[in-house]
Amino acid sequence: AHGIPAKNQFENWQDALNAGKIADAVLNATQDEMHHDSAIAAMRAGYEMLLEKPIATTLSETLHIIQTAEKTGRMLMVCHVLRYTDFFQKVNQIIKSGQLGQIINISHTENVSYFHMAHSYVRGSWRNLEVSTPMILAKCCHDLDLLYWFLDEKCTHLSSVGNLRHFTEENAPVGAPERCTDGCPAAETCPFYAPRIYLESIPIKQAVSRASNPFIRGFGKLTLNQPGIAKALGKLIPPLQTLTEYSGWPRNTITESPQSDGAVMEALKTGPYGRCVYHCDNNVVDHQIVSMVFPSGITVTLTMHGHSHQEGRTLRIDGSRATLLGKFSYSQAWIEVHEHLTNQIERYTFPSEVDQTAGHGGGDAGLLE
C-alpha cells in the first residue's frame, strides 16, 4: 500500500534493525510496551528517531531512553504533535502575548468520544494495564505536554482521581452475548454495537455531519439520511466516495482489507473488536481528573473521559484581563478571547480535522515539516 520494496518489509522491529542501517532515521510507532527496547536498539544502531508518545511505560525506561540518546548522540524527538497545530500555536501565542493578563486558572478537557473509548480502551490495544499504559498516559500525555508548553513551569503539586464506571459486567444489557455478532437483543439501542461502528461507520458519518464546512456537513447529513443518493453521488464525485465507502479509522485497524464488508464482519466475529464492551478484559479508567498547582500559583484541572458524543478537546483559560475559550474537535476548531474591560470578543476559526482530512488537526504534518 505504501510502495515499500519487499526487501524492506519486515515482520517485526528486530528484523528491521538486524538488516543493517538502511536509512538515516526511524519513525518508531511500535506499541507502548515495545518503545523501550526498540528505541534503545535503534539509537545504538545509529538511527535518529521520532518516537511515538508516550516515551515509555515507566519512569525508569523513559530515563534510560533519554540517557541512551545523550550517550549515542542520536536525535530523539517525541510525537507530541498538538504543539504543531495552528490551533494550539495560536493559544500559546495569545498566552505569551499577555493579552489574558496574569494566568489564574486553566480548565482543559479531553473529551474522548464514546466509540473511540470503546475501540481503543475497552476492546483495543490500550484496554488493560497489564499489556499497555494507563489511559491518562496513553491519551493525555499530549495535553500534559501542552500545559507545560503554555506555562513554562513545572508542576509542584498534583492529585488525581478516576475509575472505571461504565464498561463493566454489571452494566451489560440483559441477555447480551459475548459478541455483538451473536444476536444481541440490545443491538438497536446500544451505542457500542460493533457492526454499526465498523460496518456502517455511523459515528464517522455523524462527525462529518457536524463539520464547519457547509458542503462537507451537508454531504455528511446526506449519507445518514439518504445513503442511496449519497452513494450515487459518491460515484460521480470521487472525493465524496471516501465517506460513502469509508475504509479509514477505526475500520482500517481491525482488518487488512478494510474495503471489504466481508473481511470487516469476519474480524468482528473472530477478533477483539466484535466483543461486547461489557464482556471485555478491560481495566483502565473511563474517566479521570488531575488537579495541578504551579510555582506561580496557577491552578490547572485536566479532565479526561470516554463518554463524549463528539471527539475533541475543550479549553478555558482565565486570566486577570481576559478569558480564552477554545474547542478543538474532529468537526470544529475555534478560539474566543473575551476581554474583561471592553467586553469585546475576538474569535478565530481553524480548519477542523474533517475539513482538511489531516491527522490531529494538521499536527502530524506540522511536526514532520
Label the model's feature ranges.
Residues L82-A267, Y273:
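Predominantly a Rossmann-like dinucleotide-binding segment in NAD(P)-dependent oxidoreductases
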Residues A1-G3, S247, R251-G262, T270-E369:
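C-terminal helical cap and adjacent loop that interface with cofactors, partners, or active-site loops
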Residues H36-I40, L63, T85, Q89, ...:
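A structural signal for well-ordered alpha-helical segments within the folded catalytic domains
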Residues H64-V81, G101-H108:
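Rossmann-fold dehydrogenase core element
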Residues P5-T68:
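Beta-loop-alpha module in the N-terminal Rossmann-like domain of NAD(P)-dependent dehydrogenases
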Residues A1, Q14-L17, I40, I66, ...:
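Non-transmembrane alpha-helical segments in soluble domains
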Residues N28, L51-E52, V78, S107, ...:
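Hydrophobic residues in well-ordered beta-strands that form the structural core
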